[in-house]
UniProtKB/Swiss-Prot annotation:
Biological role stated in the UniProt entry: Arabinosyl transferase responsible for the polymerization of arabinose into the arabinan of arabinogalactan.
Effect of M292T: Resistance to EMB
UniProt-recorded name of the protein: Probable arabinosyltransferase B
GO CC, one annotated term: plasma membrane
Organism: Mycolicibacterium smegmatis
Main location: membrane
GO molecular function: arabinosyltransferase activity
Lineage start: Bacteria, Bacillati, Actinomycetota, Actinomycetes, Mycobacteriales
Gene for this chain: embB
UniProt keyword list: Antibiotic resistance, Cell membrane, Cell wall biogenesis/degradation, Glycosyltransferase, Membrane, Transferase, Transmembrane, Transmembrane helix
A Pfam cross-reference name: Arabino_trans_N
Similarity remark: Belongs to the emb family.
C-alpha cells in the first residue's frame, strides 16, 4: 500500500518537475524568440537591397533617330553629353536642334527640358529655361573648338566648350565653362530628340542615369531576416500562449456558440451589404487605387502612379499589394472590391457576436440595440466603404483590435493582447488613418498593463514583454519588404513637400467640407460621423451622471467611447482632411448606436422630457443630413434622384420637414419640463427606438437612390448594370461610351435647292451669319483660362486663323478633327453693330430608319458653339440662342412638309465647340429630311452661335475603338469604370507613351485630375504635355445623351520617335544608401 503511495507521490513530483521545466523553457523561448523577432524586424529597413539600374544612351544603333524614354521621376540622377564641334560646323546656316531631352515643339519644352540649339549666330545650351551657355557660333565652328561637354547632376549643370577660352569679362582667358551649382536644374527627360539625320558622328553622345532608387528587391540576407523575423514572432506568440495557460482556466471556444444563431437582423444586414455590393456607389479614389495595383507588378513596386514622381506608397499601403495580386484574376469591379464585402461581413459578425455581448446583457438582449448596430453599420458603410479605399479595412482592423483587447481583459491573458498589437500595427500600415486601431490599443492600455504587472511576478517581465515587442514590429517585414529606410524617407519627403500635407490645426476643414452641399458633404456622407456623434455625446453624459446602469458594462463602454474620441484626436494629424475618412466610424459607430439605444430607452432613461429631447436631436440630425444634395462620386451619380439639388417633396425641402419636426419635439420636451410629467404612453412610443428607425430610413434612402439610378439608366451604364454585365465579360463604361473614329464621316447630303452665299448650311436667306462669325480661341469642350492649365488640348496652340480658307471661305479652325475643306461653318459673332440673326439651312436627306439603323445610328449631331438653349442631366434646361433640328415628312404631292423640331441635348461647356445631340428616337420614323434652324435674337456681343451641318455619326464603343492593348492614360477618377483598358505602364523609371487619355466630366477634369496630375507635382501630365499633342474626340454616353460622362482624347506625337532601348544593370546598397534628393522643385 505504502509502495503504491510512494509511486504516486513520485509520479506527481515528476509531473511537477516536468511542468516546471516546460514553463522555464516557455519563458526562455518567449524571451529569446520575441527579442530575436523584434531585433530582426527593426533591422529590416536597414538591410541591403538589390537595385535595378537603367541608363539611357544616345545615339542608338548608330543612327541619329528620335527616341522616347519618359522618366517617371522626370529628372535623371545625372546627365552627361558630348557634342563634337564638327557637328556644329556641319549644320546648315539656319542651324537646328543638336539634341533635346524633349521635342523643341513640345509644350513648355524650354521651361522643363535641356535643349542644345544652334541658331544662325549662337550656340545655346538651355536647361529649364536657364541659359547655361551661349557662345558665338563662329567660335564653336572654328578650328580651336574640340567638343562641348555638358554635365547635369546634384552638383549643378555646366557646359564646357573644350578648346575655347572666354574672351571678355572678369574670366577672360579662362576656360569657356559656364553653369550653375543648382541641383534642381536637372532637366526633365522624355527622350532624346534632334534635327540631325543620318549616321551618328564619332564622339556624339548623350547618357542619362535614370533614377531607379525605388526599383529594388531584397537580397538573400534581407529575405532571410524577414522570414526569420516572422517565424520568431510566431514562436514567441506560441510561447506566450503556453504561459497564458498556466492560469488553469479552460480555454474559450474559438468560435462561441452564440455565433451560430441567425436572426432577422443578420438577414437584413448581410442582404443589404450584398445588394449594395452589386448596385451601390463606389468610393472616390477607386480608379486611383486600381491603376496603382494594375501597374505595380510591371513596375516592381507599388508606386503612387499619378503624383509624386512615382514614389512608393510605403510605409503605408500594404493592402494595395493585396489588390495587385487580385488583378491577376480580374480587374472587374465586382471582383476587385471583394475585400470590402468580406470586411463588411466580418464587422457585422464581430459587432453582433462579440462587441454587443461585451457591452453588457442589457445591450446584448435588446433587439432595438441589435437593429441600431446593424443599420448604423450599413448606413455608415455604404457611402464610404464599397470601393477600393481602405477605410473599410481599417474599420475592420480597429474592431478586431477592440475585440481582442476585450478578450485579453476578460481572460487575463496576453496572447489576445499580442494579437491585438499585431492587428493594430497592420491596420496602421494600411494608411495613417489606421491610428483608429492604435486608439483601440490605448483605450485598453490600462487593464492590459495591470495584467502584465500581475503576471510578471509569476512569469517574469521579458517573457511577457518580448513577444509583445515582436508582435508590434513584425509589420516592418511587410512594409519594408522591397524598400529601405532611405527610400521610404525620401518618398515621405516628396509627399510632404508637394502635398497635400496639412497641419493638425487645419482639421476644421474636414468638418467644413462635411457641411457644404457638395458631393463631399452629400446626404449619405454625413451619416457616419453625425450619427456616431449623436450617439456618443448623450451616452457620455449618461455614463458620467450615473455611476451604475443596470445591464451595461462600464469598462467596455468607456473603452468604446475612448476609441471614438481618440480617433477624432488622431485624425487631426493625418496629412489630408477629406470627409471619406469618416468611413472609419462605420464599425465603432454601429457599436456606439447599440449602446446609445439602450441608454436612451424608456427602461434606462425614465425622464420623458429627456427622451423627447433626444428625439428632437435625432430629427435635427436627419434635417442636417438632408440639407445637402444626394450626390455620389462620378459614375455612381448617374441616374440618382436629386443628385445635384436638395431633395424636395411637393416643393418642400425634406430638410425643412425634419427641422420642423425637430422643433416640435423640442417644444414638446420643454412642455414636459414645465409640467414635470414623467410618464406618457405617446412619448414612450415615439422614443422607444429612434436611432434604428432613423438609421433604417437613411439606409432605405441610399438603397432607393441606387435602385432608381439603375432603373433610370437601363440599358445604359449604371454601377449595378455594369456589375451584372461583368459576369459575361462586360467592360464597364467602355461598352456604353460611343466614339466617332472620324467626325468627318456621316455628314448628311443636302437636297437640291437654291442656296445663298453660305451654301446649303446657310439656306436661301441667312441673316447675320458669316463664315468667320466665331471669336478667336474657341476650341472643343474647353473654356479659355487666364492661368496656364496642365493637360489642355493642342487646339490652344494652333494658329488663330487658317492659312487657307475652308469650303465656304471660313478661316475658323474647326474642332474634333473636322476638315475645313469639307465642312462649312456659319456664325453670328461680330464686333460691329449687333443684329438679330436667323438661319434655316437647306434640307438634308435623313437615312431611312429601321431597327438596324436605329441601333447603329442613334443620333443626329450638329457641332456648334456659343450660348445655346439645350438640356443636360447636370443643368436641366439651359436657355440661350436657338439651334434646333427641324424634321420634315413627305406631303401628298411629294414635297417636304415641316413636321416638328427637336431641342438638343447640350452638355457644354458654354461657349466652346461641342456636339449638340438630337436623338433619332425623338424624330418620327416617317421623317425623310432635317435642317438646322438657328436664331440669335440677342443684341449682346457675348451671345452668339456658330453651327456646322448635321451629321449622323458612325459610332463605335470605346472598347471597340481603343481596345485592351493600347496604353491609355486613364485619369485617377475613371480607372474603375474602365477595367478593360490598358493603363500606361512604367518600369525601371520609364513610362510607356500613351495613345489615348480618358478623363472624367469637364469640371472634374478641370478642377481635380488636371491639377492633381500636373507635372509640377510629379504627375503624368508632365510627361504627356511635353511629348504629345492631345485632341478631344466626339463621344456620347449611349441612351443617356445629356450626360457628361467625361472625354476621350487621342494623343499624337509632336515628332516621330521610337521607344529607346535602355542599358540595365544592378547594384546592391545598404538600407541607408541614397543617391541624393529627387528633384521635385521647378
Amino acid at each position: 500500500m505504502s509502495g503504491n503511495m510512494d509511486e504516486a507521490v513520485s509520479g506527481n513530483m515528476d509531473e511537477a518537475v516536468s511542468a516546471g521545466k516546460d514553463v522555464r523553457i516557455a519563458r526562455w523561448v518567449a524571451t529569446i524568440a520575441g527579442l530575436l523577432g523584434f531585433v530582426l524586424s527593426v533591422s529590416i529597413p536597414l538591410l541591403p537591397v538589390t537595385q535595378t539600374t537603367a541608363t539611357l544612351n544616345w545615339p542608338q544603333q548608330g543612327r541619329l533617330d528620335n527616341v522616347t524614354a519618359p522618366l517617371i521621376s522626370q529628372a535623371p540622377l545625372e546627365l552627361t553629353a558630348t557634342v563634337p564641334c564638327s557637328v556644329v560646323r556641319d549644320l546648315p546656316p539656319e542651324g537646328g536642334l543638336v539634341f533635346g531631352t524633349a521635342p523643341a515643339e513640345g509644350r513648355d519644352a524650354a521651361l522643363n527640358a535641356m535643349l542644345v540649339n544652334v541658331t544662325e549666330t549662337r550656340v545655346d545650351v538651355i536647361v529649364r529655361n536657364v541659359v547655361v551657355a551661349s557662345v558665338n557660333r563662329d567660335r564653336v565652328a572654328g578650328p580651336d573648338c574640340q567638343r562641348i561637354e555638358i554635365t547635369s547632376n546634384l552638383d549643378g549643370t555646366y557646359a564646357d566648350f573644350v578648346g575655347l577660352t572666354q574672351i571678355s569679362g572678369e574670366d577672360a582667358g579662362k576656360l569657356q565653362r559656364t553653369g550653375y551649382p543648382d541641383p534642381n536644374l536637372r532637366p526633365a527627360i522624355v527622350g532624346v530628340f534632334t534635327d540631325l539625320t543620318g549616321p551618328a558622328p564619332q564622339g556624339l553622345s548623350v547618357s542619362a542615369e535614370i533614377d531607379t532608387r525605388f526599383t529594388t528587391h531584397p537580397t538573400a540576407l534581407k529575405l532571410a531576416a524577414m522570414l526569420l523575423a516572422i517565424v520568431s514572432t510566431v514562436i514567441a506568440l506560441l510561447a506566450l500562449w503556453r504561459l497564458d495557460r498556466l492560469d488553469g482556466r479552460r480555454m474559450h471556444r474559438l468560435i462561441p456558440t452564440r455565433w451560430r444563431t441567425v436572426t432577422a437582423v443578420d438577414g437584413v444586414v448581410v442582404g443589404g451589404m450584398a445588394i449594395w455590393y452589386v448596385i451601390g456607389a463606389n468610393s472616390s479614389d477607386d480608379g486611383y487605387i486600381l491603376q496603382m495595383a494594375r501597374t505595380a507588378e510591371h513596375a516592381g513596386y507599388m508606386a503612387n502612379y499619378f503624383r509624386w514622381f512615382g514614389s512608393p506608397e510605403d510605409p503605408f499601403g500594404w493592402y494595395y499589394n493585396v489588390l495587385a495580386l487580385m488583378t491577376k484574376v480580374s480587374d472587374a469591379s465586382i471582383w476587385i472590391r471583394l475585400p470590402d464585402l468580406i470586411c463588411a461581413l466580418i464587422c457585422w459578425l464581430l459587432l453582433s457576436r462579440e462587441v454587443l455581448p461585451r457591452l453588457g446583457p442589457a445591450v446584448a438582449g435588446s433587439r432595438a440595440a441589435m437593429w441600431a448596430a446593424g443599420l448604423v453599420l450599413l448606413g455608415a458603410w455604404m457611402p464610404f466603404n464599397n470601393g477600393l479605399r481602405p477605410e473599410g479595412q481599417i474599420a475592420t482592423g480597429a474592431l478586431i483590435t477592440y475585440v481582442l483587447i476585450e478578450r485579453a481583459v476578460t481572460s487575463g491573458r496576453l496572447t489576445p493582447a499580442a494579437l491585438a498589437i499585431t492587428t493594430a500595427a497592420f491596420t496602421l500600415g494600411i494608411q495613417p488613418t489606421g491610428l483608429i486601431a492604435v486608439a483601440a490599443l490605448l483605450a485598453g492600455g490600462r487593464p492590459i498593463l495591470r495584467i502584465v504587472i500581475r503576471r510578471r511576478r509569476l512569469d517574469g517581465t521579458w517573457p511577457l514583454i518580448a513577444p509583445l515587442l515582436a508582435a508590434g514590429t513584425v509589420i516592418l517585414a511587410v512594409v519594408f519588404a522591397d524598400q529601405t529606410i532611405a527610400t521610404v524617407l525620401e518618398a515621405t519627403r516628396i509627399r510632404t513637400a508637394i502635398g497635400p500635407s496639412q497641419e493638425w490645426w487645419t482639421e476644421k476643414l474636414r468638418y467644413y467640407y462635411l457641411i457644404l452641399p457638395t458631393t463631399d458633404g452629400a446626404i449619405s456622407r454625413r451619416v457616419a460621423f453625425v450619427f456616431t456623434a449623436m450617439c456618443l455625446f448623450p451616452s457620455l453624459f449618461m455614463m458620467l451622471r450615473r455611476k451604475h446602469i443596470a445591464g451595461v458594462a462600464r469598462g467596455p463602454a468607456w473603452r468604446l467611447m475612448g476609441i471614438i474620441f481618440a480617433t477624432m484626436f488622431f485624425l487631426m494629424f493625418t496629412p489630408t482632411k477629406w470627409t471619406h475618412h469618416f468611413g472609419l466610424f462605420a464599425a465603432v459607430g454601429g457599436a456606439m448606436a447599440a449602446l446609445a439605444t439602450v441608454l436612451v430607452s424608456p427602461t434606462v432613461l425614465r425622464s420623458a422630457r429627456n427622451r423627447m429631447a433626444f428625439l428632437s436631436l435625432v430629427l435635427f440630425v436627419l434635417a442636417f443630413c438632408f440639407a445637402s444634395t444626394n450626390g455620389w462620386w462620378y459614375v455612381s451619380n448617374f441616374g440618382a434622384p436629386f443628385n445635384n439639388s436638395v431633395p424636395k417633396v411637393g416643393g418642400v425641402q425634406i430638410s425643412a420637414i425634419f427641422f420642423a419636426l425637430s422643433a416640435i419635439a423640442a417644444l414638446w420636451a420643454f412642455w414636459l419640463h414645465l409640467t414635470r410629467r414623467t410618464e406618457s404612453r405617446v412619448v414612450d412610443r415615439l422614443t422607444a427606438a429612434p436611432i434604428p428607425v432613423a438609421a433604417g430610413f437613411m439606409v432605405v434612402v441610399m438603397m432607393a437612390s441606387m435602385a432608381i439610378g439603375v432603373v433610370r439608366q437601363y440599358p445604359t451604364y449604371s454601377n449595378g448594370w455594369a456589375n451584372i454585365r461583368a459576369f459575361a465579360g462586360g467592360c464597364g463604361l467602355a461598352d456604353d461610351v460611343l466614339v466617332e473614329p472620324d467626325s468627318n464621316a456621316g455628314f448628311l447630303t443636302p437636297l437640291p435647292g437654291a442656296y445663298g452665299p453660305l451654301g446649303p448650311l446657310g439656306g436661301e436667306d441667312p441673316q447675320g451669319f458669316s463664315p468667320d462669325g466665331v471669336p478667336d480661341r474657341i476650341i472643343a469642350e474647353a473654356i479659355r483660362l487666364n492661368n496656364p492649365q496642365p493637360g489642355t488640348d493642342y487646339d490652344w496652340n494652333r494658329p488663330i486663323k487658317l492659312d487657307e480658307p475652308g469650303i465656304n471661305g471660313s478661316t475658323v479652325p474647326l474642332p474634333y478633327g473636322l476638315d475645313p475643306k469639307r465642312v462649312p461653318v456659319a456664325g453670328t459673332y461680330s464686333t460691329e453693330a449687333q443684329q438679330e440673326s436667323r438661319l434655316s439651312s437647306a434640307w438634308y436627306e435623313l437615312p431611312a430608319r429601321d431597327e438596324t439603323e436605329r441601333a447603329a445610328h442613334p443620333l443626329v449631331v450638329i457641332t456648334a458653339a456659343g450660348t445655346i438653349t439645350g438640356e443636360s442631366v447636370a443643368n436641366g434646361l439651359t436657355t440661350g440662342q436657338t439651334v434646333d433640328l427641324e424634321y420634315a415628312t413627305r406631303g401628298p404631292d411629294g414635297t417636304l412638309v415641316p413636321a416638328g423640331r427637336v431641342t438638343p441635348y447640350d452638355v457644354g461647356p458654354t461657349p466652346s465647340w461641342r456636339n449638340l445631340r438630337y436623338p433619332r428616337s425623338e424624330i418620327p420614323d416617317d421623317a425623310v429630311a432635317v435642317r438646322v434652324v438657328a436664331e440669335d435674337l440677342s443684341l449682346s456681343q457675348g451671345d452668339w452661335i456658330a453651327v456646322t451641318p448635321p451629321r449622323v455619326p458612325e459610332l463605335q464603343s470605346v472598347q471597340e475603338y481603343v481596345g485592351s492593348d493600347q496604353p491609355v492614360l486613364m485619369d485617377w477618377a475613371v480607372g474603375l469604370a474602365f477595367p478593360c483598358q490598358q493603363p500606361m505602364l512604367h518600369a525601371n523609371g520609364v513610362t510607356e507613351v500613351p495613345k489615348f487619355r480618358i478623363s472624367p466630366d469637364y469640371y472634374a477634369k478641370l478642377q481635380s485630375t488636371d491639377t492633381w496630375q500636373d507635372g509640377i507635382n510629379g504627375g503624368l501630365l508632365g510627361i504627356t504635355d511635353l511629348l504629345l499633342r492631345a485632341s478631344v474626340m466626339s463621344t456620347y454616353l449611349s441612351q443617356d445623351w445629356g450626360q457628361d460622362w467625361g472625354s476621350l482624347r487621342k494623343f499624337d506625337t509632336v515628332v516621330e520617335a521610337t521607344p529607346a532601348e535602355l542599358d540595365f544593370g544592378s547594384q546592391t546598397h545598404s538600407g541607408l544608401y541614397s543617391p541624393g534628393p529627387l528633384r521635385i522643385r521647378p
